[in-house]
Amino acid sequence: MTIRKAIRVERSPEVVFRVFTQEIGKWWPLKEGFSFGGEKAKDIFIEGRVGGRFFERFTDGTEFEVGRITAFQPPHVVAWTWKDPSWEAETEVEVKFEPDGTGTRIELEHRGWEAGPIMQKQGQGYSDGWGIILEKFTSMI
């Protein structure tokens, strides 16, 4: 199973990519349940380089690494691994930013759900979640 979501925003790919990656802590809905740390979650970061971390920082200063950046090509694509501690394997998230007239089309794929029964079961929830996350992003940009 591969989760696919797409949405369009009326901003340039350069602006959209920068806000998505460098300002993720301003728009990601941590306090709305989209966090591994729950109530402890304070901030979220993407380190802008291949091999960098996608991680949450908690109120006590500890961190949880969601995954590692596997592609970072401004303003076109960012990708990272994603692993819940209960899963059998990692998944991968890839986000592309394509020029679309005077705006940008954002295409997200989250793949690798076939690795185990726990992951297959949780895939639908993640599909719904990515829709909410992208809507939150577009409302903040």
PLM segments and residue spans:
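A conserved amphipathic terminal alpha-helix motif
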Residues: 24, 111-141
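Hydrophobic pocket/interface hotspot
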Residues: 16-20, 54, 69, 78-80, ...
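Conserved strand-loop elements at the edges of beta-sheets that form or border functional pockets
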Residues: 9-11, 48, 71
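Hydrophobic ligand-binding cavity/cleft-lining segments
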Residues: 1-42
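Aromatic-glycine hotspot motif
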Residues: 1-14, 57, 99-107, 139
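Hydrophobic-ligand binding "helix-grip"
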Residues: 45, 55-102, 111-114
